[in-house]
Swiss-Prot record:
SUPFAM superfamilies attached to this UniProt entry: Metallo-dependent phosphatases
One Pfam family here: Metallophos
Main location: membrane
Ranges that cross the membrane: 20-40, 405-425
Organism of this sequence: Schizosaccharomyces pombe (strain 972 / ATCC 24843)
InterPro entries the record matches: Calcineurin-like_PHP_ApaH, Metallo-depent_PP-like, PGAP5/Cdc1/Ted1, Ted1_MPase_dom
Designated name of the protein: Uncharacterized protein C23A1.02c
Compartments where found: Membrane
Length: 430
């Protein structure tokens, strides 16, 4: 029949080529985490001696304000599309990386002054996006072993400035709204990597700088009665709660620790895209900030010197930094937006019985591997080494899926080309 319609035959061939190319690109896009070394754990020798944490920063889920600004149809369609893309990012990386736990590093919603009803709606959408039945209700809890095998991994949450506001905006109402939907703002949890214990701490970083520091000669922390002995004057209940929480943690036995914080720790200028800046009100409470202050950062490390790794958000472009005390901080770039599509992985691996002979003979018994992207060039950057503990080494990998328009372009192209090919084929019967 196409012989009678040579133009249709030519058109069908061109559409077929484009169609198959789009299908190939789409298949590659759904396997893109493999390009960054995110692969099924059963293919890796250290499977039984590792613990994997998947990090998502700054999704900033929108809601009613988008609909009010753009109209019901356009706003609803936009929200649906954003949720669909974010769910794709999370589930594809979860499928390939098989994490034991997930951490949402703050700015989970787009506006800190939502009423309870709207906030709960967005929290419900976030559960659907992440696949969480409930956000992990941590206290001083321990995680069950091999949680990824049943697909029901714990999802930890950290509050960001778009969730509860900066220090001057925090209140009992803001904290209560967050904790009812997302869990505690300050929490600690424990897990084992093989037989070796690891502690993770989540902190309300928005209130940590709502303090004034003064000179003090503190006694031994273990023998002190309150954090005031460290020269800290809290300016709000939230700041007092956050610092008291850190002080209580300092009294616990010291084990290797990972700190989760929305606002990154202090770094010198020109290290990250965001400069170390804090804007304060006349009453000294924090109005906005890029990093935690130098004093706050030093006090945290003074209280909990066992912090070896820090994961943070807030700086949408991301940053990697080794603090003077040797702690490594990874600020995850944003999961959404033009610079979005980023998911981070930290894998902690016990050194016992899993290293090859060549690995055992390396200069550093414990290695810290950083696989990082440069912009959107999709290529690996330099490697760095650092020590996590005498029994555990860690790898950090950043998976980059690109902005949402790539995902949409591929899906729409496949749909349009499929329809066009069916239309051309149907024309042969005319």
């Amino acid at each position: 029949m196409f012989a009678r319609h040579p133009n249709l035959l030519w058109l069908n061939k061109q559409l077929s080529i484009l169609h198959y190319l789009c299908l190939v690109f789409l298949a590659v896009y759904y396997a893109y985490p493999l390009l960054f070394g995110i692969m099924p754990r059963k293919l890796q020798l250290e499977d039984e001696n590792s613990f994997v944490i998947m990090g998502v920063a700054d999704p900033q889920i929108e809601g009613n304000h988008k609909i009010e600004a753009n109209g019901f149809f356009k706003g609803t369609l936009d929200l649906w599309g954003n949720d669909l893309f974010l769910r794709h990012l999370v589930h594809m990386n979860q499928f390939w990386g098989q994490p034991d736990a997930m951490i949402l590093l703050g700015d989970l919603v787009s506006f800190q002054h939502l009423d309870n009803e709207e906030f709960n709606k967005r929290a419900k959408r976030l559960k659907k996006i992440t696949g969480a039945k409930n956000f992990w209700q941590v206290g001083n809890s321990s995680l069950p072993a091999r949680t990824f095998e049943n697909g029901n991994i714990p999802v930890w949450t950290i509050a960001g400035n778009h969730d509860i506001g900066y220090g001057c905006e925090s209140s009992d109402a803001q904290i209560s709204k967050w904790e009812q939907a997302m869990g505690p703002v300050n929490w600690v949890s424990h897990f084992n990597v093989s037989k070796f214990p690891v502690r993770v701490i989540g902190i309300n970083s928005l209130s940590l700088d709502d303090v004034q520091f003064y000179d003090a000669n503190p006694s031994d922390i273990i023998n002190s009665k309150s954090f005031s002995s460290l020269g800290i004057l809290a300016l709000s209940k939230e700041a007092r709660d956050a610092w008291q929480f850190l002080f209580d943690i300092a009294l616990e036995p010291s084990i290797p620790t990972i700190l989760f914080t929305h606002v990154p720790l202090y770094k010198p200028a020109n290290v990250c895209v965001d400069e170390p800046r804090i804007v304060r009100q006349l009453d000294f409470r924090v109005k906005s900030q890029n990093h935690l202050s130098y004093n706050t950062t030093m006090k945290i490390f003074e209280l909990i010197p066992s912090i070896k790794l820090v994961l943070s958000g807030h700086d949408h472009m991301g940053c990697d930094y080794e603090h003077p005390n040797g702690a490594i901080e990874h600020t995850l770039p944003s999961a959404m937006g033009y610079f979005g599509g980023n998911i981070g992985f930290v894998k902690l691996i016990a050194t016992n019985d899993v290293l090859t002979e060549s690995s055992k003979n390396t200069p550093s018994v414990v290695t810290f591997l950083i696989q990082k992207l440069i912009g959107q060039r999709w290529k690996k950057a330099s490697l760095k080494q650092s020590k996590f503990s005498s029994d555990i080494y860690a790898t950090y990998t950043l998976s980059h899926g690109g902005p949402s328009y790539i995902w949409w372009a591929l899906h729409i192209s496949v749909c349009v080309l499929t329809i066009l090919r069916l239309l051309v084929i149907s024309l042969q019967h005319i």
